[in-house]
């Protein structure tokens, strides 16, 4: 069984955890929360342990949090980073790389430049085999994923005929 921590419990993280929580091969170790809002109680009411950045614990004093994000990561095999855009790169450097923990990042991050979270933008239809063995992978947004699922079969079947794709 894989122990998975979802770091970020907003519009993306709350959906991800609802999807993975019933998988018999996954144990959800908890969720990371960055802002002390109603989503904290929402996660707790749904039975999830909530962890917050150690430096922000005082801001969450009105909530029944389970500890700091660092301790949750120490108990996890994989983290799905659904934190606010740009925070994933900071988390990678501060938390994930020092712990050598496998990480999947949401579409608000980048695969380009010095703040790149990965060199791979994952799409199961396009580069599934390339993701095997990677420590850090970025999952594209729903729009990017959808385009990959449509465009990859076209590229595969009509590679010599297609000069370019225009997507609007």
Q: Model regions: which residues?
A:
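N-terminal Rossmann-like NAD(P) cofactor-binding subdomain of oxidoreductases
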Residues: 1-168
């Amino acid at each position: 069984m894989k122990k998975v921590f979802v770091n970020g419990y907003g519009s993306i993280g709350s959906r991800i955890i609802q999807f993975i929580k019933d998988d018999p091969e996954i144990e959800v170790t908890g969720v990371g929360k960055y802002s002390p809002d109603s989503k904290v109680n929402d996660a707790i009411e749904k039975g999830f342990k909530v962890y917050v950045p150690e430096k922000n614990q005082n801001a969450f004093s009105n909530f029944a949090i389970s500890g700091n994000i660092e301790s949750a990561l120490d108990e996890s095999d994989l983290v799905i980073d659904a934190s606010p855009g740009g925070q994933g790169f900071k988390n990678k450097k501060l938390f994930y790389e020092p712990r050598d923990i496998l990480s999947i990042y949401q579409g608000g991050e980048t695969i380009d430049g010095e703040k790149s979270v990965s060199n791979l933008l994952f799409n199961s239809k396009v580069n599934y085999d390339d993701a095997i063995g990677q420590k850090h992978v970025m999952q594209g947004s729903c729009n990017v994923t959808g385009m990959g699922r449509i465009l990859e079969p076209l590229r595969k079947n009509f590679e010599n005929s297609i000069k370019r794709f225009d997507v609007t």
